[in-house]
Amino acid sequence: GGRARVFKKGSFIYDGGPTVITAPYLFEELFSLFNKKISKYVEIVPLDLWYRFVFSDGQTFDYSGDEKSMEQEVKKFSDKDFEGYNNLVNFTEKIFNKGFTDLSDKPFNNLTFMLKQVPSLLSLKSYKSVYSLVSNYITNEKLRRVFSMHPLLVGGNPFTTTSIYTLILFLEKK
């Protein structure tokens, strides 16, 4: 969803949307509700490059869904942070499973239900910001910025948005 458009300023092209992430498997699920296959109607084309980060010193980080490419990109900045990156991804899978799979379709309109979620949300470090959680796993400042950017996609600030939003990092991989 969102503002599917681009605009140009000088030699740069900016993406003006869409701003909401929708995983392809959710479209497949929607079509299956009507006993249809999405592939008969739409071709979903995977992108080789999802984002390119350009830092003020000219260094770039090409963010993609390809694990080998991601390993090379992370190691370009910090060999030791590759293990931290993998640990971060593994932790965000737990956040995804709770925050997206278990809770995204549940109404939080009952105090008892909300209170029952507190222990698991605490164990998932939901009290931390996205940037703070990423910093537990990644030491290189540029890599911290790369892996903290996901709240920006939904209008959030990585320094203040709850770390539950790191589930987007894992959602992208599904």
For each feature predicted by the language model, list its residue ranges.
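Residues forming the flavin
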Residues: G10, L26, G156-K174
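Short, intrinsically disordered/low-complexity patches at protein termini
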Residues: I38-S39, F108, L167-F170
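Rossmann-like flavin
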Residues: S56-T162
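A short, structure-level motif marking secondary-structure boundaries and short turns
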Residues: F12-I13, M114-Q117, K174
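N-terminal glycine-rich phosphate/pyrophosphate-binding loop and immediately adjacent elements
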Residues: G1-K94
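Generic alpha-helical structural context detector
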Residues: S32, S148, T166-L169
